[in-house]
Every structure is written in structure tokens, then in C-alpha cells.
């Protein structure tokens, strides 16, 4: 896991860590002893390791650069990362919460709530790289700069995968960026307005808020 930076949830040892409590306690203790923690988001297809919260400042310091990013991303790279996260993960999470897949025809499924949680390309759409460049390259720099300096760096770090002119979710995109912290800030913030202006409106609400409202309506 340390060498790969992430492992799929389907890996036998990852599956064991997620279901075997004794194994997980031992794993967490071993990671904690060296200042690390396992990052697990049930909606992400991969797990990862990261520095434990209490060692962030001793390791990185409280510099301005660390406050912006602890993986060495520039402001432009970080801005594009958030845009891509919003375009891929926000609709993906909505599909996951509603137990829908990209191939669904929109018809209601009476058994949808009992369906297993889907991951990967079943629920995560891909972005056209050409479309992304047309919409956002003018504000981030010229096309060559965005392709060579921004997208290439995000792909190198594992946040995205570039295949056949399309941008796909990388193994770290969903697991390292916290949906609960970011979703409302994007949906109700300036970025949501910017995305709408270029033809990529975000979902109207946080997917978890919609589910809570549905459950509340069912109780009454």
C-alpha cells in the first residue's frame, strides 16, 4: 500500500481490513506507530494511507504552501483538481446514494435501495479533455500549459487517468478529497456558479441531504 499509494477495495487484504475488526485494529496501531492512518471512504473504489492528523504540522510545518496543499500542487493545479472533482464526484455520489448507474435509463427501481453500492466506471462518468480545455483553459492558462503542467501532474499523482481523450476518475480522487467538506461549498458557492455558466451545473443539493429528506418523508 505504501509503495502503490492506493489499493482497490477488491484486494484481498484490503477486504480483510474492512471486515475483520481485529485485523483492522492491529493495522491501525501499526500505521499510527509511524504517524500514518488508513484512509477509507466507502464510496471510493480505493483505499489509501496518509499522515495522521496530529503529525501534519510537525511534518509539513505551518507554511503558506502547506496550507494550500501538502502534495506540492500549485494554485492552478489545485483549482483544476477541484473542478474535475466537482464534475466527476458530485454526480457520481448522487448516483451512488440513489443506487443508480450510468447505464440506467432513468426508470424507477423499486429494489434500488437494496442494491449493493457500485464503484468505478459503473457510476463515475468521464470528461472530454477537449471540452474541459475549451471551458477552463482560458482562465487557467493556454491549452498546452493545462495539458502539460496541470493535467499531467494530476495524472502523475493518481487523481485522474487520461485515456483516449477522456479524463477518468483516478484512484485517489474520491478517497483523498472529502465530499462532506467540499460538496456544499461547491454547490452553493462561486464555483457552482462558474460551472453552471460553462454548461456544467452541479447537482441542486448535496446527495446526502436528499437521502435524509427522503428518509424523513418516509417516517411521516
Q: Could you say what each language-model-derived stretch is?
A:
Residues 31-41, 155-168:
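A short, conserved structural fragment
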Amino acid at each position: 500500500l505504501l509503495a502503490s499509494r492506493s489499493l482497490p477495495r477488491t484486494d484481498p487484504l484490503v477486504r480483510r481490513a474492512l471486515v475483520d475488526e481485529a485485523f483492522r485494529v492491529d493495522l491501525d496501531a501499526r500505521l499510527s506507530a509511524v504517524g500514518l492512518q488508513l484512509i477509507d471512504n466507502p464510496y471510493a473504489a480505493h483505499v489509501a494511507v496518509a499522515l495522521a492528523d496530529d503529525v501534519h504540522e510537525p511534518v509539513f510545518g505551518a507554511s503558506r504552501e502547506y496550507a494550500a496543499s501538502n502534495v506540492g500542487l500549485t494554485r492552478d493545479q489545485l483549482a483544476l483538481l477541484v473542478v474535475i472533482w466537482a464534475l466527476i464526484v458530485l454526480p457520481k455520489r448522487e448516483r451512488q446514494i440513489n443506487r443508480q448507474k450510468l447505464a440506467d435509463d432513468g426508470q424507477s427501481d423499486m429494489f434500488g435501495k437494496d442494491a449493493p453500492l457500485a464503484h468505478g466506471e459503473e457510476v463515475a462518468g468521464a470528461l472530454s479533455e477537449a471540452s474541459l480545455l475549451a471551458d477552463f483553459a482560458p482562465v487557467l492558462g493556454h491549452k498546452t500549459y493545462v495539458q502539460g503542467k496541470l493535467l499531467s501532474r494530476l495524472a502523475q499523482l493518481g487523481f485522474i487517468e487520461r485515456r483516449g481523450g477522456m479524463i477518468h476518475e483516478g484512484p485517489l480522487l474520491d478517497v483523498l478529497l472529502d465530499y462532506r467538506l467540499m460538496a456544499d461549498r461547491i454547490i452553493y458557492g462561486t464555483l457552482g456558479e462558474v460551472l453552471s455558466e460553462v454548461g456544467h451545473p452541479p447537482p441542486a443539493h448535496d446527495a446526502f441531504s436528499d437521502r435524509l429528506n427522503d428518509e424523513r418523508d418516509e417516517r411521516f
